[in-house]
Design a protein with these regions (language model features):
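Hydrophobic alpha-helical connector segments
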Residues: 61, 75-112, 167-174, 204
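N-terminal positioning helix adjacent to the helix-turn-helix/winged-helix DNA-binding module
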Residues: 5, 12, 16-19
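Helix-turn-helix
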Residues: 15, 23-65
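Amphipathic alpha-helical packing segments from all-alpha helical-bundle domains
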Residues: 89-90, 108-116, 123-158, 169
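Predominantly extracellular/luminal regions of secreted and cell-surface proteins
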Residues: 70-74
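Helix-loop "lid/cap" segments that line or gate small-molecule binding pockets
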Residues: 97-105, 114-126, 214-218
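C-terminal peripheral helix-coil segments that are non-catalytic and often amphipathic
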Residues: 97-101, 146, 150-158, 172-248
């Protein structure tokens, strides 16, 4: 009997997790079954169970691969790495413009799956514990929360921002608002109701621009004076406007 190579195992498992990802885009995460994956891959039941013990084991590996494939951590570090030359408002503008880019690109991909996992967590916390328990890699939003909390605390200590709440409360607000925007945009994209007068506003870039303005107000961000500030504000504004102009 020929020896099974590591490459063979990796390729087989990737076919299984790729099938799971495709199915999660077509259906809700909670309704994807092991039989669905068997049918999609063409593998036998034993061929699937050889590598994974159940559907949640597959989801866990799928999410790990998603986090490796689509990461915004370097972009977060790049923006926060300019804290000495950019004002807090400019940093906030750039972070949220980056999030708008990410949400637009992944709205019906990773963002959809992430949202449906949060719904599953409410209904079946035992399953989420199994799915997420073995994942060591820090997710995009977890990393953003950790890094921005450090940044806000540092800027407050330097007197560059003047928030009327602590960093933990501020990040809790941002996280909750982001989750609401994510849900609204996904639902609007899946079940667009043309009679709703707000439908046209339920777009990632538009709503995240509103959140940016709210956060800048909450932190009391002060723009530095001079040409650089004007130039930076104009450049950041363009980050938000570019897609809005394309949609009009």
């Amino acid at each position: 009997m020929p020896k099974v190579t590591e490459e063979y195992i990796v390729n087989k498992k990737k076919r299984i997790t790729d099938a799971a990802y495709e199915l999660c885009l077509e259906k809700t995460v909670s309704t994807v079954t092991m039989q669905d994956i068997i049918d999609r891959t063409g593998f036998s039941q034993g061929g699937i169970y050889r590598f994974y013990k159940d559907i949640d084991d597959i989801f866990s590996d799928m999410i790990r691969q998603m986090r490796e494939r689509v990461s915004i951590k370097e972009k977060i570090d790049e923006i926060l790495g300019q804290k000495e030359i950019l004002t807090p408002q400019e940093i906030t503008d750039r972070l949220f413009a980056m999030l708008a880019d990410f949400m637009e690109k992944e709205l019906m991909g990773i963002e959809k799956i992430d949202f449906e996992l949060s719904v599953l967590a409410m209904n079946r916390p035992d399953r989420i514990e199994k799915i997420m328990g073995g994942i060591q890699e820090v997710g995009n939003m977890e990393y953003l929360t950790m890094r921005t909390m450090e940044y806000f605390k540092e800027q407050a200590a330097l007197g560059r921002i003047h928030a009327n709440m602590n960093a933990e409360e501020l990040l809790a607000f941002i996280s909750s608002a982001y989750g609401g925007i994510q849900m609204t945009c996904i639902v609007n994209n899946c079940y667009r109701h043309e009679r709703n007068p707000l439908t046209a506003l339920y777009q990632p870039r538009i709503l995240l621009k509103m959140l940016t303005q709210a956060v800048n107000e909450l932190i009391g961000a002060e723009e530095s004076s001079g040409v650089d500030t004007v130039r930076g504000a104009e450049n950041n504004g363009m980050d938000f406007r570019k897609e809005e102009e394309g949609q009009s």
